[in-house]
Curated annotation (Swiss-Prot):
A GO MF term: structural molecule activity
Site (Cleavage): 610-611
Region: Immunosuppression, residue numbers: 661-679
Residue runs in coiled coils: 642-692, 735-771
Organism lineage: Viruses, Riboviria, Pararnavirae, Artverviricota, Revtraviricetes
Region (Fusion peptide): 615-635
Gene Ontology CC entries for this record: host cell plasma membrane; membrane; viral envelope; virion membrane
Role description: The surface protein (SU) attaches the virus to the host cell by binding to its receptor. This interaction triggers the refolding of the transmembrane protein (TM) and is thought to activate its fusogenic potential by unmasking its fusion peptide. Fusion occurs at the host cell plasma membrane. The transmembrane protein (TM) acts as a class I viral fusion protein. Under the current model, the protein has at least 3 conformational states: pre-fusion native state, pre-hairpin intermediate state, and post-fusion hairpin state. During viral and target cell membrane fusion, the coiled coil regions (heptad repeats) assume a trimer-of-hairpins structure, positioning the fusion peptide in close proximity to the C-terminal region of the ectodomain. The formation of this structure appears to drive apposition and subsequent fusion of viral and target cell membranes.
Extracellular side: 1-784
Protein name, UniProt field: Envelope glycoprotein gp150
Length: 855
């Protein structure tokens, strides 16, 4: 087709192909570093008709042909995808370019009119005698003075009118929007919070991070429904242990044990059996478990996505929490545990809603409850053992020391402990791997350093299965008719001494093996012999699951009923509840994108005493929370706030640099992918709103934007000056009061983006601009041609200068040969000798021979 000046080799580009080409154009521009040029695809505007698409094709046909050629030339692996960088730069710096052009034009005009302006001067010099003097009235006014005064007065009036016009224009009624105000506000309940875990070389992070999905954004961080209690806690306990000892499964972990078993006649007749067994090296596990049994893990939880944590106690902003001491306390469950957060999830009617088999009791409500209890234990020298003779280092002579018998059963009951509260615990038929049955309580107990004992921390277990028949199940009741039960009272009464023991062994399943770990030697190192006492060091926030116990409708006396006085306590660590307890002092906040402020903010003067926003900013009283006063409630936040913003910006820059250099190859971890996703989402949002912000008069480098009155009045956005009260209001309260205005401002942006007329106008303006600056894209070609010409001319001149003498001689010889002359060069002689004449010989003529003789 020849329409629009196309050649026969170019084909008309239709709407479908044009839509893909414009998408390519926008995608190419997104490959560059920001800020990006906003791109709008007119073919994707809602409600566009086929006729409008054809019109767009006619308008943009030239640009589409260029884009089509660009698609053919682009090779992503060569890194030449972005070819509009220069045009985008001029697009964003058009104001500066025009200012420079205007300045240049004005200066040239001055140079051109300089002589004509000088001709207006009429200098008249009147010679007067020196003895004569004239006053000012007698001197009069020369033309220079008269025209100079007129020029000054007219210039002053002109600038006065100009400044007055500018002041009137700037002072026109408009709404001020503060972009990225320096304050933080609480997040909405509907917003999604992305958490990350930070604990160097600590495998427990991933387990606790998995529970964070049940935390939602709220002023007081709350929890949602969770999985089954028993399965959840059991899985966490097993997973934490496996990860804590994962180093034991690397390298030389397995040892080979070779044994030869002989028969009655020795090895005759092939009666020997060679046995080779591969066993794990348990010493590695023992070393790590000894430390792990102390039961504390230091982790920090961090926020991503631009949100921050506000500490209500210290009034500081941070991205991560303080290190949380998560206790790895064991738990107590009954057999066949079925208790869930939401009992409606249990569909089987035969399964109790929350309880155990062979009992009529079930628990309808379980909630986390802080324990606020203290355990005290003491030990007296009463267990079996033996005295051995050893060398004393401090008396320099032999003495007898007591060594307890750790294999004795009495060692396990040699401790007496009590609690400060009545605690009724649930029972169970077995633990994870059949090491303990019944009901029990576990806690850490700290012993201070003394003269005879070193500082140590023990893990103590108190249980209630020391009956006549320990094979029966402790049911924590007094009904003897329960089948297979050993009725005991599972209530640990306050201020009552109970026999307890050190947890010196435990059983754990490692891969496919059930392994029993004997920690006797490790406990012996603590020097438990003698008399000593310890106090529980339960971390703050440690507690139980307190469940209300209700008897069912079954009146069978062979099933265990609920305790008489209170519900059942489950001694286990709930990650969600523990995190909730640790995070209760934090509040999730964010920095708003826009804040609607009165025009009074733009008219602020430093000497005024009213508390406008600038005064708050100048005094560094950035108010962060809703309801805070206008005083210095957040003075300490400012420094850290700027550090947080700087750190966040540096992180984004590093991630962007990693994207450009490694082409997404470094982004392998989940939290990095999450941050990248948020970054891409922010870029898309910026692309979507940049055009509307330009239409509203907001430059990306401006912090204050003034919205035209026409758009402002169209949406009925009026500010309540009574609430503002000349700035005597906190920023947090002002943000909450004007939240509806923020939403309306978003509506203005969305309407401008989706408005077909505005989009078409913007495209036409962009097309005109590209027509004006289209020659810029040809600059490299011009430079190549110019450089080639300069190099060619310079090389030609250089060759000419080098070869010029030879060329002159050649031309001279050729000329003489054509004319028939030969140059005879005579040798040089001294000045004193007689100068010999040099004659030319023509056609064989010789010197001294006449023509006649020659003939």
């Amino acid at each position: 087709m020849a329409e629009g000046g196309f050649t026969h080799n170019q084909q008309w580009i239709g709407p479908e192909e044009a839509e893909e080409l414009l998408d390519f154009d926008i995608a190419v521009q997104m490959n560059e570093e920001g800020p990006l040029n906003p791109g709008v695809n007119p073919f994707r505007v809602p409600g566009i008709t086929s006729q409008e698409k054809d019109d767009y094709c006619k308008i943009l046909q030239t640009k589409l042909q260029e884009l089509k050629n660009e698609v053919k030339e682009v090779k992503i692996e060569e890194g030449n995808a972005g070819k509009f960088r220069r045009a985008r730069y001029l697009r964003y710096s058009d104001e500066n370019v025009l200012s420079i052009v205007y300045l240049l034009i004005g200066y040239l005009r001055y140079l051109i009119d300089h002589r004509s302006l000088g001709s207006l001067r009429h200098d008249i010099d009147i010679e007067t005698p020196q003895e004569e003097h004239y006053n000012n009235s007698e001197k009069g006014t020369t033309l220079n003075i008269k025209y100079g005064r007129r020029c000054c007065i007219s210039t002053f009036i002109m600038y006065l009118i100009l400044f007055a016009g500018v002041g009137i224009w700037l002072g026109a009624r408009a709404q001020v929007v503060w972009r990225l105000p320096p304050l933080v506000v609480p997040v909405d309940d509907t917003e999604i919070i992305f958490w990350d875990c930070w604990a160097p070389e600590e495998p427990a992070c991933q387990d606790f991070l998995g529970t964070m999905i049940y935390l939602k954004a709220n002023v007081n961080i709350s929890i949602q429904e969770g999985p089954t209690l028993g399965n959840w806690a059991r899985e966490i306990w097993s997973t934490l242990f496996k990860k804590a000892t994962r180093q034991c499964r690397r390298g030389r972990i397995w040892r080979r044990w070779n044994e030869t078993i002989t028969g009655p006649l020795g090895c005759a007749n092939n009666t020997c059996y060679n046995i080779s067994v591969v066993v794990p090296d348990y010493q590695c596990y023992v070393d790590r478990v000894d430390t792990w049994l102390q039961g504390k893990v230091n982790i920090s939880l961090c926020l991503t996505g631009g949100k921050m944590l506000y500490n209500k106690e210290t009034r500081q902003l941070s991205y991560c929490t303080d290190p949380l001491q998560i206790p790895l306390i064991n738990y107590t469950f009954g057999p066949n545990q079925t208790c869930m957060w939401n009992t409606s999830l249990i569909k089987d009617s035969e399964i109790p809603k929350c309880g155990w088999w062979n009992q009529v009791a079930y628990y309808d409500t379980c909630k986390w409850e802080e324990a606020n209890v203290t355990f005290q234990c003491h030990r007296t020298q009463s267990q079996s053992g033996s005295w051995i003779r050893t060398i004393s280092s401090w008396k320099q002579r032999n003495r007898w020391e007591w060594r307890p018998d750790f294999e004795s059963e009495k060692v396990k009951i040699s401790l007496q402990c009590n609690s400060t509260k009545n605690l009724t615990f649930a029972m169970r038929s077995s633990s994870d791997y059949y090491d303990v049955q019944g009901a029990w309580i576990e806690f850490g107990c700290h012993r201070n350093k003394s003269k005879r004992h070193s500082e140590a921390r023990f893990r103590i277990r108190c249980k209630w299965n020391e009956g006549n028949n320990i094979s029966l199940i402790d049911t924590c009741g007094t009904n003897p008719n329960v089948t297979g039960a050993n009725p005991v009272d599972c209530t640990m009464k306050a201020n009552t001494m109970y026999n307890c023991s050190l947890q010196d062994s435990f059983t754990m399943k490692i891969e496919d093996l059930i392994v029993h770990f004997n920690m006797t030697k490790a406990v012996e190192l603590y020097n438990i012999a003698g008399n000593w006492s310890c106090t529980s060091d339960l971390p703050k926030g440690w507690g139980y699951m307190n469940c209300n116990c209700t008897n069912g409708t079954d009146n069978s006396e062979t099933k265990m009923a609920c305790p008489k006085n209170q519900g059942i306590l489950r001694n286990w660590y709930n990650p969600v509840a523990g995190l909730r307890q640790a995070l209760i002092k934090y509040q999730v906040v964010k920095q708003p994108e826009y804040l609607i402020v009165p025009e009074e903010v733009m008219q602020y003067k430093f000497k005024q005493k009213r508390a406008a926003i600038h005064i708050m900013l100048a005094l560094a009283t950035v108010l962060s929370m809703a309801g805070a006063g206008t005083g210095a409630t957040a003075i300490g936040m400012v420094t850290q706030y700027h550090q947080v913003l700087a750190t966040h910006q540096q992180a984004l820059e590093k991630i962007t640099e990693a994207l450009k250099i490694n082409n997404l190859r470094l982004i392998t971890l989940e939290h990095q992918v999450l941050v990248i996703g948020l970054r891409v989402e922010a870029i898309e949002k910026f692309l979507y709103t940049a055009f509307a912000m330009q239409e509203l008069g907001c430059n990306q480098n401006q912090f204050f934007c003034k919205i035209p009155p026409s758009l402002w009045s169209m949406y009925n956005m009026t500010l309540n000056q009574t609430i503002w009260n000349h700035g005597n209001i906190s920023l947090g309260n002002w943000y909450n009061q004007t939240r509806d205005l923020q939403n309306k401002f978003y509506e203005i942006i969305m309407d401008i983006e989706q408005n077909n007329v505005q989009g078409k106008t913007g495209i036409q303006q962009l097309q005109k601009w590209e027509n004006w600056v289209g020659w810029i894209g040809k600059i490299p070609q011009y430079l190549k041609g110019l450089l080639g010409s300069v190099l060619g001319i310079g090389l030609g001149i250089l060759l000419l200068l080098i070869c010029l003498p030879t060329l002159v001689d050649c031309i001279r010889n050729c000329t003489n040969k054509i004319l028939g002359y030969t140059v005879i060069a005579m040798p040089e002689i001294d000045d004193e000798e007689v100068h010999l004449s040099v004659e030319l010989r023509r056609n064989g003529r010789q010197c001294g021979i006449s023509e006649k003789e020659e003939e």
